[in-house]
Amino acid sequence: MYLFRRTSKAVKRKRRTHFKLSVPGMVECPSCGEAKLAHRVCKACGTYKGKEVISK
């Protein structure tokens, strides 16, 4: 049986530097000017691609 060497804090933290969240792609709504997620319906006015999808 082989005893493995303990992973040090530095090695563990260097490996985890790539585990991070990405910033969501925010764009300005062409109808109302609110910030919204790209390729999704605007929560403020309910429009998508210039058409009203959700009536507010």
UniProtKB/Swiss-Prot annotation:
The Swiss-Prot or TrEMBL record annotates one GO molecular function as:
structural constituent of ribosome
Kindly list the residue ranges recorded as spanning the membrane.
none
Q: GO CC terms for this protein? A: cytosolic large ribosomal subunit
Its GO biological process annotations read: translation
Sorted alphabetically, the keyword list is:
Ribonucleoprotein, Ribosomal protein
Concerning InterPro entries, the annotation shows: Ribosomal_bL32 (IPR002677), Ribosomal_bL32_bact (IPR044957), Ribosomal_zn-bd (IPR011332)
Q: Which NCBIfam families match?
A: rpmF_bact
Per the record, the similarity remark reads:
Belongs to the bacterial ribosomal protein bL32 family.
Q: What is this protein called?
A: Large ribosomal subunit protein bL32
